[in-house]
Swiss-Prot record:
GO terms for cellular component: cytosol. This is Transcription antitermination protein NusB. It comes from the Bacteria. Residues 17-28 have a biased composition (Low complexity). Residues 1-35 are annotated as: Disordered. Involved in transcription antitermination. Required for transcription of ribosomal RNA (rRNA) genes. Binds specifically to the boxA antiterminator sequence of the ribosomal RNA (rrn) operons. The keyword RNA-binding applies. NCBIfam families: nusB. Belongs to the NusB family. The keyword ATP-binding does not apply. The gene is nusB. Pfam families: NusB. The lineage of its organism: Bacteria, Pseudomonadati, Pseudomonadota, Betaproteobacteria, Burkholderiales.
Length: 177
């Protein structure tokens, strides 16, 4: 038996916490970019739209009054909120073939996160496709169900070659060497 005050030499050192993250691995609020914050507020607004059927203008007014909105990239938030609501049916048609269940069975959080991912794939060409997926995974980890981030990852990885074909192909070619 080993003494806890004198561990054996082979004992592993205590795990060091990742700085700038929460217990779930999500980034802490202080280390988030304006665009990351915009995605969070857009997610909350899109959730209101999906669950309550609220009008985009009413949601927008409510969301802009939330604490911390001033730190978000307002232009990116506007693009996500209004763009996702305007193109929701089209985005659902893109997402549906990637699903293993009916859209109505998808959590509204994961649904909204997938909308954000699809919208950014199509309209935010300055954001690399892997960053889009990573940001959406982080949103799903922070706000979604236990394994929702895995589902979001699978769906967006399935859509990336379709929506960002050139960029994905170039990344895969570079990885092969």
């Amino acid at each position: 038996m080993t003494d806890s005050a004198n561990p054996t030499p082979s004992a592993r050192p205590p795990r060091q916490p990742r700085t700038g993250t929460t217990g779930t691995g999500a980034r802490k609020a202080g280390s988030k970019s304006g665009r990351s914050r915009a995605r969070e507020f857009a997610l909350q607004a899109l959730y209101q739209h999906l669950v309550g059927g609220n009008d985009a203008t009413a949601i927008d007014v409510f969301t802009r009054d939330l604490s911390g909105f001033h730190k978000a990239d307002a232009a990116h938030y506007d693009a996500l909120l209004h763009g996702c609501i305007t193109t929701a049916q089209y985005m659902d048609e893109l997402i549906a073939p990637q699903l293993d269940r009916k859209m109505s069975e998808i959590s509204p959080i994961e649904h909204a996160v997938m909308w954000i991912g699809v919208y950014e794939f199509q309209h935010c060409q300055d954001v690399p496709w892997r960053v889009v997926i990573n940001e959406c995974i982080e949103l799903a980890k922070e706000f979604g169900g236990t394994d929702g981030h895995k589902y979001v990852n699978g769906v967006l990885n399935g859509l990336a070659p379709q929506l960002r074909a050139t960029e994905v192909a170039a990344d895969k070619a570079a990885a092969r060497g």
